[in-house]
Amino acid sequence: MMGIMVLCLTSCQNPGQIHRPNADTLYVGSVQASFPTAYMPWLSREGIAPTIAGMLYDSLFSYDEDTGNFVPSIGQEWYYVDQAGEPILTEDGSIDYARLEEVYSDPSHKYLAVKVIIHDNITWSDGKPLTVEDVYYSLDIATNNLLSNHAGALAWTSDLRHKYTNGVLTQRGLFTYEHGAREQGYEIAEEDKDTVIYLHVNKVLGSVMPLFTSVLILPKHIWEPVVTPQNQLNSAAPTEETLYRYRYPVGSGQFVLDTEESGSQQIVLRRRTDYHRTKEDGSPLYNIETIKYVLYQEINVAIYALLKGHIDVLDNSVSSNYLQLFEKEKDLFISNAPGTYIQTLVLNVNPVSSEQNPIRDLLSIKDFRRAIALAVNQEDLIKNVLNGAGIPASSGLMRSTLPDFYNPDADYLPIDYQARVAEANAILDTIVPDRDKDGYRLLNGERITFSILGSPGEQDCISYLEIQFQKIGIKVNYAAKGTQPESTYLYTSRFDMTLHGVSFSLSNIDIMYNAHFSALGRTSNYGRLVNRELDTLIENMRFTLNLNTKYDLIKAIQPILAEEYYKIPLYTSNVISVARTDRFIGYNIVEGSTVLNTSTLQNLKKSNVSR
């Protein structure tokens, strides 16, 4: 297979000349089905769209997983406040969680009060100043589905105590100088009216996370004049005025879209000279003046373009099969970054009644699921599927690189694989002892066979799982998940097993634990797991105001997740990406990211041997 790849990449196209004519432009290859033509940041969260949106627009803050702190963006600082509006901070300026619990643990207090102060020197790309009225507008419309028509925005703001019913504001949880701050008891001086906003959020320590990091702030002066219940923000049939705003974005991010140069085959971004965030010495935050994204629809063609010098960076993770090829090339920076997503095998443990059948019913038996989990050999998958570019994943589905949350007690299954297979067969001999002439187990005379939903790129993984499960007499095969697996199969229980990547950390756990293991319906709990003990622990973890208790509950949840054998870990894959070093240097490896990450963009500079 590797020889075929190399032959194709070196001979299937004529070399041609190097197409990086501008020395100040970073040429970035992106493998997508297509490039977006509309850039309203809430329109799409797939493909390259969120990457571009994150460069054109800003959120209030970003989150640093390593430090656990919010990094200023539009927001300059934030803190919880008490009933008198006084900051709940320690002497060193960090959140005083002990006092927060003391102040708000009383059940009579229904919410946490948060004060956000934004920078006073931000402008939109059209030159208009950005104020808290833009922040208010963005969070307000996110809660008003009659105007936004955006289910994701409702999820981002689910813990914000600012609610609409049929377009009517029924509960106010946002307060500025112009919107009820004084009436609520928050005194904002007139000179601070453009920079201070108060939020009321549910008594959940993670409630501010999506409000701060997921909601890209929109310019009120651009959208308020055109958005109505008849012409919603997220419109399938936008008016001419709305369509113009989609295509010619006005943002507050570090780049602006060059609409004249951008089109269906390329996206050109120009660095703003007036962006409010800079390096400590006052120089631009990013050294790159222009970024040109070039569309490729095949990964092999994109790699060929990189090797031949048509692009500087390939902004896609690639298979570890290409590592051998890259290592033979000069002028390449290979990023083999640790991954943050755990690939899991999700079992349909509780399908809706219309999708139940005798074979699928076996997955509702916990001991049967334990046998499946025992048969998984992560080391073998990492060796053969990832070519060694990955690490084993915990049965508690928490990364061991997060020591404050990872609980090794969740990893209690035997380490020796032969012992695991022997135990799995002993379990199955008590449940489905009959086998056919090929050694596969039978149920009522029928071979037990499960289909595993996956993408074409996941066929290798499923093929090796087929070999592993054969050792315990269980037959599995690959089933294409298609383009809309959630609505076609997963939300409707029309599957046996599926591959699914998960990633849990303090930044998402309040939402994701519930979505993956408790909530039913259109959630990531595809197999409809129901475990009341687990539900209670997740609920307690979510609502405790004691940070130490929260950490303890996160650890307590992991062994219970492991014992359900519901989302069985397969591996954590590295994120492999590549860039050229003949024109730019300063690429950084960041956990869970391709080489084109924020750290790289802030450190990239021209190479002395640029040519």
Task: Kindly give the residue locations of the regions a language model identified.
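N-terminal lobe/hinge region of extracytoplasmic solute-binding protein
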Residues: G29-S105, V250
